[in-house]
């Protein structure tokens, strides 16, 4: 194993240790938010937000690392980026275009968008893990990150559902979320087309994880710290 790979793994382990230690200090370890069922669970809104912000940041870091590794190994000189622009399955969601727009968006809308994004990634993340496992010569780093992201996405969704319930008690979150239909592209026998589909999916995951991270930090600042952050 070369020094560059060792350095990348060391950085990821350090980040994971920092996140784990922070969560342990707050009594919110990286397990389901309510391991004994919602009826036995009392977690403060501040703790829920602290956990969610750290997990979303971790997911975005993993997504960026996974995309960069795939790009270097499979996409150099292929022009995949031109096909990936504006082709995400979540593009139909009316998300703010930048941080300034997000700051002007009502917190209920931002929370609904986060929930929609998280739910829309459950299925593609499951299939991403499955298909990467079957990819010949796929780096272990890509698979390990995909597995972690799938697990953390579920935990973050659970936490966001609890946050929604505390911030908007009695409200029902029933907005439909985009359905992913890209599995056939990940399974095509055309190698370039298959790699292009993987590239597009990872590009979209990095984009959406960045949005979720940004929206969550804004909500945390607005709701928990009354914009004093």
From Swiss-Prot:
In terms of superkingdom, the source organism counts as Eukaryota
Which residues belong to the signal peptide in this entry?
1-30
* Keywords linked to the UniProt accession: Disulfide bond, Hormone, Lactation, Phosphoprotein, Secreted, Signal
Q: Name one GO biological process term.
A: positive regulation of lactation
Q: Which cysteine pairs are joined by S-S bonds?
A: 34-41, 88-204, 221-229
Q: Spell out the InterPro entries in the cross-references.
A: 4_helix_cytokine-like_core, Somatotropin/Prolactin, Somatotropin_CS
Pfam families with a match to the protein in the record = Hormone_1
> What is the first-listed, main subcellular location in coarse terms?
secreted
The entry assigns this protein to a family as follows: Belongs to the somatotropin/prolactin family.
Q: Where in the cell is it found?
A: Secreted
UniProt GO cellular component terms: extracellular space
Q: What does this protein do?
A: Prolactin acts primarily on the mammary gland by promoting lactation.
Subunit details: Interacts with PRLR.
Residues bearing Phosphoserine? 56, 64, 120
Query: Which protein are we looking at?
Result: Prolactin
Give any GO molecular function from the UniProt entry: prolactin receptor binding
